[in-house]
């Protein structure tokens, strides 16, 4: 600080300036804090179709109420989109992570169930061993989907059956409807088939 008068006036002037500077800094910190604490901008999310319809889409209006300055773009796809190429900020996936360079966090387990309609099993018989599936009508996702790997435990040893159905669909709900209508055997997440098992529509 410049000091052209007596020492007492110089100190008083210096203190006043210091207080103003500190006040300006406090205001700046408060402004930055308010921006930081209020998320804003564009959020691009991708998630599988069936999970999105049941567990994400119904809650988006609540999210918008909580964060009105966040613009949400939801890409619903059963394909594993490349996050970098598609400029995706957040991906929710029901599968094992294949790219270890991505930052991931497990949200929950996803138990799956192999199911068929009672009428189909009455007609074709119930498979006892994974090898029996080769003799059955399989409803699967399209080729290359990670959901086509059906995992079993046989004599305490893991066994994988790669599903390749004569009926291949790219949508979980479409597979579910085909299975309910006696189309064959499928494997879907329990959150998809649970209520149908409970009602006896699937077994």
Regions found by a protein language model. Give the residues of each.
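Acidic, Gly/Pro-rich loop/turn segments at junctions of secondary structure
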Residues: 75-169
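All-alpha effector-binding/dimerization core of bacterial HTH-type transcriptional repressors
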Residues: 38-41, 47-49, 54-59, 111, ...
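Alpha-helical "hinge/linker" immediately C-terminal to small N-terminal DNA-binding modules
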Residues: 11-34
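Central regulatory/effector-binding core of bacterial HTH transcription factors
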Residues: 40-103
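Hydrophobic hinge/microswitch elements
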Residues: 160-203
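Structured loop/turn residues at beta-strand edges in well-structured enzyme cores
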Residues: 5, 23, 38, 86-88, ...
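Single conserved hydrophobic/aromatic residue that forms the stacking wall/gate
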Residues: 1-8
